[in-house]
Regions:
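Acceptor/aglycone-binding surface of glycosyltransferases and processive sugar-polymer synthases
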Residues: 68-86, 91, 100-130
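A conserved acidic beta->alpha catalytic loop
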Residues: 44-52, 99
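Short helix-capping segments at alpha-helix termini
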Residues: 31-36, 58-64
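Short beta-strand/loop segment that forms part of the nucleotide-sugar
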Residues: 36-47, 68-70
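N-proximal low-complexity "stem/linker" segments adjacent to membrane-targeting elements
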Residues: 1-29, 36
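Acidic helix N-cap motif at the loop->helix transition within catalytic regions
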Residues: 18-22, 49-57
């Protein structure tokens, strides 16, 4: 998958009020450095505490951020599916809105895509807690 020109970054949200702003900020920083066309797709999966409304404030200030809402909580998989359907760019990255995974790893994932069609990453804790 050489020569990626555009990226859609998808965040499913559910009860992520305390992390959504950090995720948006970090994502914008990293995606601007990558220097490719990008969008950030945020899917509020019926959050009862207003995570999506926080994201929507950022979307009003930045047209690269788009927020979609489920009327009620229908699950993580449904939020991902909505995010993928709403994505318009060729390369889609899925990262949870709770800041569990480091968005700073995006450049490494892009590099891995040069020789592969799919890259899956996960956290691993070894005996040294790394």
């Amino acid at each position: 998958m050489n020569n990626i020109k555009s990226i859609s970054l998808v965040f499913p949200l559910y009860k992520d009020k305390n992390t959504v702003e950090v995720m948006i900020f970090k994502s914008l920083q990293i995606l601007k450095k990558i220097k490719k066309k990008f969008e950030i797709i945020i899917v509020d999966d019926g959050c009862p505490e207003g995570s999506g409304k926080i994201a929507q404030r950022y979307a009003k200030k930045n047209q690269k951020i788009k927020v979609f809402f489920h009327a009620k909580n229908i699950g993580y998989g449904a939020a991902i599916k909505t995010g993928i359907k709403k994505s318009k760019y060729e390369c889609i990255f899925l990262i949870d809105g709770d800041n569990e995974y480091n968005v700073n790893d995006l450049p490494r994932m892009l590099k891995a895509l040069k020789n592969n069609d799919l890259v899956i990453t996960y956290r691993y804790k070894n005996k040294n807690n790394i």
